[in-house]
Amino acid sequence: MGLKLSRGPVKEKSPLEFTRVHILTYFTTNSYLRNLVSKKRRRLIIGGYDLDMSYISDKLLAMSFPAERMRAVYRNPLWQVKSVLDMRHPDHYKVYNLCIEESYDPDNFYGRVERFPFDDNHVPSLKMIQLFCESVHSWLSLDPKNIAVVHCMAGKGRTGLMVSAYLVYGGMSAEEALEMYASRRTTNNNGVSIPSQRRYVKYWSDLLSFSKKGPPEVKLPQEHSRELLRIRLYDTANVDSVFFVVSELQEVPNEMYRPSVELARGCCRQFKKGYCRSSSPRYYISHVNCDSEEDEEVTDGEEPHLVVQMDTESSIIDEKTCLDFYFDKPVRVSGDIRITFYQKMIGSRLFYTCFNTAFITNGLLQFSIGELDKVGGNGRSISGPDFSLELLFGPACSKFGKFLSRDDLSLS
């Protein structure tokens, strides 16, 4: 004869816990907060759900993060996303997560999840863009019913960069892809708004060559290092010094994510009138066609193609306030570079920019205020009407380049 185990008394929820559960249930089923957070992003209303997701094409779906617990109050609830995808594309969807800051169990989507993580409001490596496009192409080629679901956190910037890159991989121009994403993802045609992210879509476009059939050939640039000599902020206002940090995305073995590693830091200051830094190279001759090993070999009878690169100094510059920093020892940079500017060394970021050294065509990179990233009120307050960030680099190929002093050139 067995023993009967009586059920213990059921523990009632405390009033506080009961209220908490009801509040959470209300907000996760009510889309008011999620509509508020999604701003101008297009939403999909289906099956009683109101979700922050948009079809960019019949094969590409962009959305914000599929969240659980409290985050589901203002992001797409994961269970609702899963329900909609299972209803519309059963067994034919794969999710691409671009977030480095958040993840979830891939089993929520039957294991069909792949991660390509990079920092929010920033850019991935060109290699990551290639791997992403090849993965999406491979998945979509398996079955005509397959679709790719791409998200970051808000489902706008990083998502827009990668979706636009895949549209370029499919044959569009960079501008066409960015415009298509903007019109399909937002109600105000403001899709990929961060200049560096748009810049990388254009970089990607330059690396593709198309044949009549099949995917394009990708020609990733070889490692291309340059020496950063000087940073100048041209036409500044209301400020006498600006701090900066130069960093580089560095590869980690067996990891997809490339962290940003600091290479140098300093402070751009206003030099007094008449200040002369004779040790700083102002002019040099550079061999411009030395991007590959074949170009570096110049025969005795062949004159190398030389170009004079100048850090221009003229009377008009003297009329503007410029903040300068010269590196005593040039900083060698290679690949994907990020330079961030601060009002103070700790906090108070003004703006930043990202670029790849393989796309530096001469010794001077210039960025207007509209070409810099996340420029807020503080950044605009120090910028004059002709503001420009100027980065001066050494010769592309030291084999044929030599520094010249100001007196070595006669200038008209």
Curated annotation (Swiss-Prot):
CDD domains, per database record: PTP_PTEN
> What PROSITE patterns does UniProt report for this protein, alphabetically?
C2_TENSIN (PS51182), PPASE_TENSIN (PS51181), TYR_PHOSPHATASE_1 (PS00383), TYR_PHOSPHATASE_2 (PS50056)
InterPro entries named among the record's database cross-references: C2_domain_sf, Dual-spec_lipid-protein_phosph, Prot-tyrosine_phosphatase-like, PTP_PTEN, Tensin_C2-dom, Tensin_phosphatase, Tyr_Pase_AS, Tyr_Pase_dom
SMART domains per the UniProt record, alphabetical: PTEN_C2 (SM01326)
One of the GO biological process terms:
phosphatidylinositol dephosphorylation
How the protein is activated or inhibited is described as: Inhibited by vanadate.
Keyword vocabulary terms for this entry:
Hydrolase, Lipid metabolism, Phospholipid metabolism, Protein phosphatase
Top-rank lineage group of the source organism:
Eukaryota
> Domain Phosphatase tensin-type: where?
42-211
Instruction: Write out the tissue specificity statement of the associated record.
Output: Expressed exclusively in pollen grains during the late stage of development (at protein level).
Question: Which Enzyme Commission number(s) are listed?
Answer: 3.1.3.48, 3.1.3.67
The entry's active site is: C152 (phosphocysteine intermediate)
**Effect of inactivating the gene:** Pollen cell death after mitosis, during the late stage of development, characterized by collapsed pollen grains, shrunken, with highly deformed exines and reduced size.
Which GO terms label this protein's molecular function in UniProt? Answer: phosphatase activity; phosphatidylinositol phosphate phosphatase activity; phosphatidylinositol-3,4,5-trisphosphate 3-phosphatase activity; protein tyrosine phosphatase activity
The UniProt record lists the C2 tensin-type domain at 239-396
Catalysed reactions listed for this entry: O-phospho-L-tyrosyl-[protein] + H2O = L-tyrosyl-[protein] + phosphate; a 1,2-diacyl-sn-glycero-3-phospho-(1D-myo-inositol-3,4,5-trisphosphate) + H2O = a 1,2-diacyl-sn-glycero-3-phospho-(1D-myo-inositol-4,5-bisphosphate) + phosphate
Which family does the record claim for this protein? Belongs to the PTEN phosphatase protein family.
PANTHER family, per the entry: PHOSPHATASE WITH HOMOLOGY TO TENSIN, PHOSPHATIDYLINOSITOL 3,4,5-TRISPHOSPHATE 3-PHOSPHATASE TPTE2-RELATED
Q: What does this protein do?
A: Protein tyrosine phosphatase that also exhibits lipid phosphatase activity. Can use phosphatidylinositol substrates such as PtdIns(3,4,5)P(3) as substrate. Pollen-specific phosphatase required for pollen development.
- Official protein name in the record: Phosphatidylinositol 3,4,5-trisphosphate 3-phosphatase and protein-tyrosine-phosphatase PTEN1
Look up and give the organism this protein is from. Answer: Arabidopsis thaliana (Mouse-ear cress)
Q: Which gene encodes it?
A: PTEN1
